[in-house]
Amino acid sequence: MGKLTLLLLILLGWLQYSLWLGKNGIHDYVRVKDDVVVQQGNNAKLKDRNEQLFAEIDDLNGGQEAIEERARNELGMIKPGESFYRLVPESNHRNANTAPSTNTPSNNIQR
């Protein structure tokens, strides 16, 4: 009976080693589980970004308003006879006053 007990203890020890320290053991499982959570978060961010891009594509394909908005914001285009005023934030206005320049407050308004 002693040999059978010894054999079973050795088998149990080998199984415990495989479970805790072996390939595809508990440590690998926990690491992969954490990686899956991180990847799911990245996938959710990318899915939101894709939805925004698809919405923007639909706007650009469907209407002139989106094209006009992009032309105004990115290219600074204005319609004929229209005046464009750029408001300078207060912090930029202070920095402009402290630095010696030829800009006056009336020059900060663009037409």
Swiss-Prot record:
Residue runs in coiled coils: 33-63
Keyword match Membrane: yes
Domain of life the protein comes from: Bacteria
A Gene Ontology biological process term: FtsZ-dependent cytokinesis
Record localization: Cell inner membrane
Stretches for region Disordered: 90-111
UniProt xrefs under InterPro entries: Cell_div_FtsB, FtsL/DivIC
TM region(s), chain numbering: 4-21
Main location: membrane
Cross-referenced Pfam families: DivIC
Periplasmic compartment segments: 22-111
Topology of the protein relative to the lipid bilayer: Single-pass type II membrane protein
Gene Ontology CC annotation, any one: cell division site
Biased composition regions of type Low complexity, renumbered to the chain: 95-111
Membrane side Cytoplasmic: residue ranges: 1-3
Keywords, alphabetical: Cell cycle, Cell division, Cell inner membrane, Cell membrane, Coiled coil, Membrane, Transmembrane, Transmembrane helix
Family: Belongs to the FtsB family.
Annotated function: Essential cell division protein. May link together the upstream cell division proteins, which are predominantly cytoplasmic, with the downstream cell division proteins, which are predominantly periplasmic.
UniProt xrefs under NCBIfam families: PRK00888.1
Quaternary structure, from the entry: Part of a complex composed of FtsB, FtsL and FtsQ.
UniProt-recorded name of the protein: Cell division protein FtsB
